[in-house]
Each structure stands twice: as C-alpha cells, then as structure tokens.
C-alpha cells in the first residue's frame, strides 16, 4: 500500500513539473521576443529620423550655396559663378522668359522642412507602421529636392514680386498675343481682340450690288379665260341684289322715329288686345316753378384760340400736324396744275375681259430686255425708262393680265377647298355579313344543326343553277 502511494505521488509531481516547465519557458520566450522587437523598432525609427534630418540639413545647405550665384540660361547648361560681376559679363545672352524666384526661398524651404519633420516624427512614434513611415520619409526627401531645385538670381530680387504676380494673374479673355507687331521691348505685345476683328473682318458694303433683271410678259391661258367668262355669265344671270342708298329725307325721318314701342294693354278677363294708352307709358310731370336765377358774369374761356402745344406742332416749329401726322404724309387732292400733261385714269373691269375674250381688244407685249438695277443710278436714266415700260397701252394690257391671273389663283384655291370638303363629306359604307342562323332541338342539337345547314346549302346551290 505504501509503495502504491509513493509511486502515485512521484508520478504526479513528475508530470506537473514537466508541464509547468513548458508553460514557463513559453511565457519567458514570448516576453523576450516582444522586448527585442520593440527595441528593434525603436532603433530603426531613431535611425530613420536621424537619416531624414541629416539629409534635409544637407539639402538646405546645398540650396543656400547654390542660390547665391546661379542663373538659368534657356537651352544651355547652368553655370556656377563666384561673383555677380562675372554673371553679367559671361551670361549676357539671357532670355527675358526666365522664371525668377525671390531670395527668401531658403527661409520658405526651412519652414516647410520643419513642418514636414514634425509630421514625420509623429508618424515615426507609431511602431506598428514602421514600413509605411520608411516609404513616406523617402518620398518626402525626393519631393523636397524636386520642389526646391529652382535657383534664384540675386540681381533681380526687386522685380521678382512683380513677375510672380504676372505669373499668378489669370489671362484676360479680351487680350491676344501678337508677335508680328513691333514693340520697344523684346517682351510680347498684348493687343485687344477688337483691333484684330476690325482688321480681319471685311466691312460689308452698305449699298447692295447691281442686279441683272430680265423683263418679260406672261401670256394668258385660254382655258382659264373661258372659265372666268362662264363665271361672269352666271353672275349676270343671277345678279346680287344691292341695297339702294338712302336719301337724306329718309335719313331725317328715321332719326325722328321713336325707337321704344308703346306698351300694349290686355284685357285680363278676355285676354284680347284692346288699345294703347299713352298716359300709362308717359307719366304726367308736374311743372316746376321757374326759380329766379341771378345773372352772373361768365369768364371768357378763349376756346377759339389754339393751345400752345398745337401751335408748337405747326410746320415752322415742328413737322407734325395737329393729329400727329407729318405734313408731307397728309393726303392731298391733286390740283389743276398737277393734272397738266397727265393721262386720264382708265378703269378696267369685266367688260374689258369679255372684249379680250371676244378678241376685240388686242394686248400689247413688251420685248424681252435685260436691265441693271442700281440704287445710285442718275435720275435721267430712270426717266428714260418711262417711255419704254410705262406707256398707257402697256399698263392697260398688264392690268388685264393681272386680273386674269388673280382670278386663276382664286379658282385654284376654291377647287382645293371643294376637294377637301368632298373628301370629308363622303359617306362611309360598312359591309356587314349576316351570320348563319339555325333552328335546332334541345334534345339533339348537333345533328339538327347539321341537317339545317345541309338543307340551306342545297337550296342555295339549286337557286344558283
């Protein structure tokens, strides 16, 4: 019994000691590994910080040295000089389009680098993002070298601010660069666009160009002439009754006639029209006593004298007459002096058209000729054309032609309207097919319907024969 108890105790201690040592060693190993990792991260971050700070300090020193005496020459290599006098002597062929930065770029770079180091130090303290900090630090170094690699000339520090403003200033949309124009300076000349528009766009002539016109006469169609004559014949057969004009006496009588009729009295018992009572419509009015009116002197209104605004509109002061129309626009009848050497007016009507249809009146035609119309032709040339194109015989014949053509146009319009109305008035016909009807018995509907159909078909075939 004692042996068994001892054996169990020793086995339990052995097993427990083995398991405990394993867990203890595991705990110690994990703690040491974490400590070593944190130390490594700290060392790496400190090394990165020292390298980034040293690199930035070196870049700032290089920039200070380089910005003392450096100039940019277009399409040439940059040259380092020891003194500003040598710059003027050796680099005399400089272009005016070089971009110059102020001497305060070193201070700007310092402030920028300080800000960047602060942000970088905050990022480095985070041990979990060590790899990201490495990449960011490398990118910041490269960006600083690119951004601050613009050397500055010491001779043009005063004009640097103006040039910076010119670069930042937006281009005016109303300006255009013109290199062909000669200027005092070598700089580009800026000229407004309006000057170019005036120079480039060709001014259109206000006066229209000459027009070549051919003068001809249009012949009359005989079919249209016959149709017009038939129309006039129908109008003669069925003349339109026109109301005769009223005489002056009848007008006076119509004005005196009372417009209000007298009221009619009906007998309530029989309902018959009896007579008119004047007294019932016109009520008797009591005569008022004539009041004594005192005689008052009335002031003169000077109604016969024209007003000042009408006087100011008279021709010497103003071209407008009293109704507000200029004096040259007022229609005036021609005087006897105006009618001298003027042919009497000729009225053209249906009678002349019938005479032309019966070939009693010949129409005069003008020869085909070409004219050049110009707005600035002399008056003598225009007056010479009156004897050719405006003779009384030619004007008469042209008016008859115009009447026929006008009637032709009206006839075509009426025909088109009648066609449209006829199309709309046409009656619509629908073909309705009669459905077959059968009488069948409810006891045997199918067979009875078939028998009825056969009988109908046999009757139809016999009737056709």
Curated annotation (Swiss-Prot):
Residues 153-173 have a biased composition (Basic and acidic residues). It holds the Pfam family DUF851. InterPro entries: DUF851. Residues 118-137, 451-465 have a biased composition (Basic residues). It comes from the Eukaryota. Residues 138-150 have a biased composition (Low complexity). Coiled coil: none annotated. Residues 95-173, 407-426, 443-465 are annotated as: Disordered. This is Uncharacterized protein C45G9.8. It comes from Caenorhabditis elegans. The lineage of its organism: Eukaryota, Metazoa, Ecdysozoa, Nematoda, Chromadorea.
